[in-house]
Amino acid sequence: MNSKVFAVLLLLALLTCILSEKYCPTPRNTSCKKMNIKNNCCRDSDCTSNAFCCAEPCGNFCHKASDKPGGRRVDPNASCQTGYVYW
């Protein structure tokens, strides 16, 4: 009996973790018409208030987490520098 209760509680805990996952919001623009981009962040730790560092067409920006997938978080291991990046 105890193992069944444990299994149910474990399943509920896993579902809660999966359903509470947060994402970067979908970017407003799909392309960038500028000749330069500006990275306001390169990793989540560059953002305040538990925001995510999200990749967008015109650079990386901090955004509040979204419940729906659609955006892309910046890879913290990728080569990145904050500020303007010229093509």
From Swiss-Prot:
It comes from the Eukaryota. Disulfide bonds join C24-C54, C32-C58, C41-C53, C42-C80, C47-C62. Residues 1-20 form the signal peptide. Residues 21-66 form the WAP domain. It is found in: Secreted. GO terms for molecular function: toxin activity. One of its GO terms (biological process) is defense response to bacterium. GO terms for cellular component: extracellular region. Expressed by the venom gland. Contains 5 disulfide bonds. InterPro entries: Elafin-like_sf. Keywords: Antibiotic, Antimicrobial, Disulfide bond, Secreted, Signal, Toxin. Has antibacterial activity. Belongs to the venom protein 11 family. 01 (wap-1) subfamily. This is U14-lycotoxin-Ls1c. It comes from Lycosa singoriensis (Wolf spider).
